[in-house]
Design a protein with these regions (language model features):
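N-terminal signal peptide c-region/cleavage motif recognized by signal peptidases
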Residues: 16-18
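Sequence/structural segment immediately N-terminal to covalent heme-attachment motifs in c-type
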Residues: 22-41
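Sec-dependent signal peptide recognition
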Residues: 2-9, 14
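Short pre-active-site segment immediately N-terminal to redox-active cysteine/selenocysteine motifs
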Residues: 33-34, 42, 56, 91
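Intrinsic, low-complexity terminal and presequence regions
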Residues: 20-21, 47
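Axial heme c-ligation environment in periplasmic c-type cytochrome domains
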Residues: 46-53, 68-103
Length: 103
């Protein structure tokens, strides 16, 4: 029984880690398409749009999921909700991987 539980826990950790390790190149392409006009090249931030480069992956995923759920959490929430709602889990992971890599 302990072996089965250890296997289940290991499998869950593997799945959660793979969800956090998105495709940087796919994230770069999606960022250029959807995010760069406001957040600047490589996520450096522009005017009232925050710097995203180098942020931790779990933080970025959490923020995008919050916006995707329709929750307002900042002054640009309406725009962010509109931009995040069409994103899939994979696209969010890809964006997070790309932005995290921009250090």
């Amino acid at each position: 029984m302990k072996g089965l539980m250890l296997g289940v826990v290991s499998f869950c950790l593997l799945i959660s880690n793979s969800a956090l390790s998105g495709d940087i190149e796919a994230g770069k392409a999606r960022y250029a398409q959807n995010c760069g006009n406001c957040h600047g090249p490589g996520g450096m931030g522009l005017a009232s749009y925050p710097k995203l480069k180098g942020k931790e992956i779990p933080y970025l995923i959490d923020r995008l999921n919050t916006y995707r759920a329709g929750t307002k959490i900042g002054p640009n929430s309406d725009l962010m909700i509109m931009m995040a709602q069409p994103l899939s889990d994979v696209e969010i992971a890809n964006l997070a991987a790309y932005l995290n890599a921009q250090k």
